[in-house]
């Protein structure tokens, strides 16, 4: 049994805390707001994960020092834009040998850094030997109800990925390992952009053909950027790549898809975000990915058009027309290049 601190009290943090508690770990969850901690201590996070009766051993507190005291593992389940701040606040209370696990799917907007890089910038590069990320197709609403789910734990050190695998894995929550930290982080973050775009197509009333094209070509541009940043191309064919992309682009639970639908139906960006009533990571990630693509010299047409809709007022319908009106391409040449790069 491990003593685990869960930093965050949203739907995903609560669902994963439930998994950990059901695995007989001692889990204390940190909530920023007292009323949220009270809901969790009463047995149900009615604000973010309604309908899920929490494990009796799971409890929450607003005292960060108390939550982190002597924790063997610290799981950060907060949105990417709050990650650095909570690292800074937590650092004085985290044991020097504690394992750090991040479960957020995003990139830091102000620096364009992956979240493992953010952690290394605050704790030093040595922290990466005990750092891992958990990602994959996994909506909190289903995980909380013990619906069978498969995810991937990635870390630079395979023993760290295996530690996370042992910590979380259960009959209903299957965990694979992957040494490609870069690819798993990017897959989890970038699929939110494609989900926004697919949602916009939904909102415009386009059909399954359009959505299939968006998802397939979206995966191609995610893979191009990932490869340029040092990721293993095969990662994007796995749970953190195509797996997460499918569920985020198609599920009624997907915040990014729902936000995109609202935009496609004519709502302003602010109105669309407010209609979701939760953090929509894909909006910030679109800005970061647009900058990264420019810096890396990588073509990302869906990201480009989504960026123009979100930040420069391009109409969603014109964005789709721009994508359909691009110059001729040869798909086989792209696939051949990817295969060649894997072999090399």
Curated annotation (Swiss-Prot):
Source organism of the structure: Desulforamulus reducens (strain ATCC BAA-1160 / DSM 100696 / MI-1) (Desulfotomaculum reducens)
GO biological process: carbohydrate metabolic process; glycerol-3-phosphate biosynthetic process; glycerol-3-phosphate catabolic process; glycerophospholipid metabolic process; phospholipid biosynthetic process
Pathway(s) it belongs to: Membrane lipid metabolism; glycerophospholipid metabolism
A GO CC term attached to the entry: cytosol
Location of the active site: 191
Role: Catalyzes the reduction of the glycolytic intermediate dihydroxyacetone phosphate (DHAP) to sn-glycerol 3-phosphate (G3P), the key precursor for phospholipid synthesis.
Record carries keyword Lipid metabolism: yes
Keyword Cytoplasm in annotation: yes
Name of the protein described by the UniProt record: Glycerol-3-phosphate dehydrogenase [NAD(P)+]
Gene3D superfamilies per the UniProt record, alphabetical: N-(1-d-carboxylethyl)-l-norvaline Dehydrogenase, domain 2 (1.10.1040.10), NAD(P)-binding Rossmann-like Domain (3.40.50.720)
Origin: domain of life: Bacteria
Enzyme class: oxidoreductase
Gene name of this polypeptide: gpsA
Similarity comment text for this entry: Belongs to the NAD-dependent glycerol-3-phosphate dehydrogenase family.
């Amino acid at each position: 049994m491990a003593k685990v601190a869960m930093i965050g009290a949203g739907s995903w943090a609560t669902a994963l805390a439930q998994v950990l508690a059901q695995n007989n770990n001692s889990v204390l969850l940190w909530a920023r707001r007292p009323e949220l901690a009270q809901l969790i201590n009463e047995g149900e996070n009615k604000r973010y994960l309604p309908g899920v009766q929490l494990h009796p051993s799971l409890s929450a507190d607003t005292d960060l020092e108390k939550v982190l005291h002597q924790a063997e593992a610290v799981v950060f389940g907060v949105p990417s834009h709050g990650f650095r701040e909570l690292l800074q606040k937590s650092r004085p209370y985290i044991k020097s040998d504690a394992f750090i696990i991040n479960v957020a799917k995003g990139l830091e907007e102000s620096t364009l850094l992956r979240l493992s890089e953010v952690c290394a910038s605050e704790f030093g590069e040595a922290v990466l030997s005990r750092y891992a990320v958990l990602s994959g197709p996994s909506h909190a609403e289903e995980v909380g109800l013990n619906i069978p789910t498969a995810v991937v734990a990635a870390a630079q050190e395979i023993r760290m990925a295996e530690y996370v695998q042992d910590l979380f894995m259960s009959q209903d929550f299957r965990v694979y390992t992957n040494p490609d930290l870069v690819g798993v982080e990017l897959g989890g973050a970038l699929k939110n952009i494609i989900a926004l775009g697919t949602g916009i197509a939904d909102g415009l009333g386009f059909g399954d053909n359009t959505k299939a094209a968006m998802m397939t070509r979206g995966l191609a541009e995610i893979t191009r950027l990932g490869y340029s940043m040092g990721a293993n191309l095969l990662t994007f064919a796995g749970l953190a790549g195509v797996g997460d992309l499918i569920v985020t682009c198609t599920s009624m639970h997907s915040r990014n898809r729902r936000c995109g639908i609202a935009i496609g139906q004519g709502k302003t960006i602010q109105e669309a975000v407010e209609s979701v009533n939760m953090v929509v990571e894909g909006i910030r990630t679109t800005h970061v990915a647009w900058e990264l693509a420019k810096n890396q010299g990588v073509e990302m047409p869906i990201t480009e058009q989504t960026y123009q809709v979100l930040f420069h007022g391009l109409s969603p319908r014109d964005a789709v027309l721009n994508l359909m009106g691009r110059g001729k391409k040869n798909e086989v040449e792209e696939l051949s290049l990817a295969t060649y790069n894997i072999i090399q």
